[in-house]
Amino acid sequence: MSNPELLSEEKAILVETLKNKLQALAEQHVDVLESLAPVVRKRVDVLIEIQSQHDELEAKFLEEKAALEANYQKLYGPLYSKRSEIVSGVLEVEGETEEREEKGVPDFWLKAMKNNEILAEEIHESDEEALKYLKDIKWCRIDDPKGFKFEFFFDTNPFFKNQVLTKTYHMIDEDDEPILEKAIGTEIEWHPGNCLTQEVLTKESSESTKPITKTEEYESFFNFFSPPQVPEDDAKIDENTAEELQNQMERDYDIASTLRDKIIPHVVSWFTGEAVQDEDYGASWVDDEEDDDDEYSDEEA
């Protein structure tokens, strides 16, 4: 298996490729401002200036927000550590006197992730036994290059040798908006015969003594650690390929955002199912509001 870091260095950055493709498409359209009447153009110029002032304030807000989040992330640290110790059985809670063989909270992270709709789609039945060995998931911000990093901690297991699997997201600022530049995942060192992402099939050939081998790719949660790769030749990336790669990266980033913003900070609620009920309630509340709006519209009509 190739080293993801080497691949990312040798290949063009996907975000640049997509930007070039989109730029080419944008040039085909008429400039909206040039098509406006002079008096309307003056008004729009003022609106653009207002928007510019707004964007400056928003940039300051995002900067202060990032600093505040970083500060509270440090405060959360001891709580996450204690949570991890209880889940893994390193720390027993006060008041427990009965000796039991079962330590900690079995299948804690697996059950929590399966209760989330986005992550449940990524977890296949063949993944579950391996994910039972998952002890903890942590994330942290990185500054050089800018982005964030996940660490998945596993007990010793029969599937792979790694004790820690990592996934790092490198971000760039584009018009004050963070955009994914690339993602780098750990190369998983699978134990022979236990790889969950692919299998090498061997078939005897009747025409020669050399057997024919074929690699069968499997859907698996552990593909999360093998981000989408960019073709070596940018010229071969047509519009459809660029769109497909963009969709893959967006899906990958959705998974990362779910882990970072929902699962890690509120994993207990996802384990118990409380978070699922909260999300369902929120969706119902939005649907009810939309129904009310439709009723008002019907009455007005």
From Swiss-Prot:
Where does this protein have coiled-coil stretches?
Answer: 15-69
**Key words of the record:** Chaperone, Coiled coil, Cytoplasm, Nucleus
Q: Which GO terms describe its molecular function?
A: chromatin binding; histone binding
Q: Which cysteines are joined by disulfide bonds?
A: none
Top-level lineage group: Eukaryota
Nuclear export signal, short sequence motif: residues? 36-51
List this protein's GO terms for biological process.
double-strand break repair via homologous recombination; nucleosome assembly
Q: Where is this region: Disordered?
A: 278-301
Which InterPro entries does this chain map to?
Answer: NAP-like_sf, NAP_family
**Where in the cell is the protein located?**
Nucleus; Cytoplasm
Concerning Pfam families, the annotation shows: NAP (PF00956)
**Gene Ontology cellular component?**
chromatin; cytoplasm; nucleus
Provide the function of this protein: May modulate chromatin structure by regulation of nucleosome assembly/disassembly.
Report the sequence similarity comment from the record. Answer: Belongs to the nucleosome assembly protein (NAP) family.
The entry's free-text remark on domains says:
The acidic domain is probably involved in the interaction with histones.
Q: Which PANTHER family match?
A: TESTIS-SPECIFIC Y-ENCODED PROTEIN
Query: What is this protein's name?
Result: Nucleosome assembly protein 1;3
Species, as recorded: Oryza sativa subsp. japonica
